[in-house]
Regions:
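Internal helical hairpin/lid segments
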Residues: 195-231
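N-terminal glycine-rich "phosphate-gripper" loop used for MgATP/nucleotide binding
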Residues: 71-87, 106
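Short, solvent-exposed amphipathic alpha-helical segments in soluble enzyme
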Residues: 24-29, 89, 219-225
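Short, conserved loop/helix-junction motifs that constitute active-site signature segments
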Residues: 3, 91-99, 226-231
Length: 231
């Protein structure tokens, strides 16, 4: 990677890590990709289903924002960031982005990403999770080569385009706008809250897994009926 040895910090803002093995495996693999990897002191904390209590996880966010690593990569998703949104120092997070920190993740990280967009903006990265994407064993399918390659290129500034599979005959679209979104369930949960970004003419993307089709349809209908898809 062109930004060889850039600092990458692993942290757990939401669900608890059930095992440290995937975390260690992810750190080792990311190190081999050229990142200088460190692990937040509370990344393996455990309180019930969370990676530490709310105070611990909130302090970790603010601490990481102060450290300003090149990449702040969440270890996993789950649930927990929504509980912190009313107390996050958004200006501190925004200053870290301005200083070059790339906050990366998906799933529950959508709460932080959209919250930051709502409270003054700042570019974040919808991307892989350390343990889920870089911590899998060979028996679990290992690391996806495309994910690995795109992540390295994106974090080094070398990624020029991302391709998607589409139906036969689809000729593509020529549109421009703010690219925003994330996990569909989290996107919907932020509607009518202070942490909902008001985007006009944007391009909304959504992701979700293990949801029944009717739930996906219900969430999309809610966005449509709330006027989000017509903005």
């Amino acid at each position: 990677m062109s930004d060889a040895g850039c600092g990458l910090l692993l942290f757990s803002p939401a669900g608890v890590l059930r095992s440290v093995v995937p975390l260690r495996r992810a750190a080792a693999r990311l190190g081999k990709l050229g990142f200088s990897v460190s692990i937040d002191a509370d990344a393996t904390a455990r309180i019930q289903r969370f990676a530490g209590d709310d105070e611990t996880r909130l302090a970790a966010l603010h601490r990481i924002a102060g450290l300003r690593p090149s990449v702040a990569l969440a270890t996993r998703g789950g649930y927990g960031l929504t509980r912190l949104l009313d107390r996050i120092d958004w200006k501190r997070i925004a200053r870290s982005v301005d200083a070059g920190t790339r906050w990366v993740g998906m799933s529950d990280m959508t709460s932080l990403q959209l919250g930051l967009l709502a409270h003054g903006g700042g570019v974040t990265w919808a991307g892989p999770l350390a343990c889920d994407d870089f911590g899998r064993s060979s028996a679990e399918g290992g690391v996806d080569d495309v994910t690995e390659g795109c992540f390295v290129e994106a974090m080094s500034g070398a990624l020029e385009a991302v391709g998607f599979r589409t139906d036969v005959g689809f000729d593509g679209l020529d549109v421009r706008g703010t690219l925003w979104g994330g996990n569909l369930a989290i996107v919907n949960s932020l509607l009518a809250t202070p942490h909902w970004p008001r985007i006009k003419g944007g391009i909304l993307f959504v992701e979700d897994v293990n949801e029944h089709p009717y739930r996906v349809e219900r969430n999309l209908l809610q966005l449509h009926q709330a006027g989000v898809l017509d903005a």
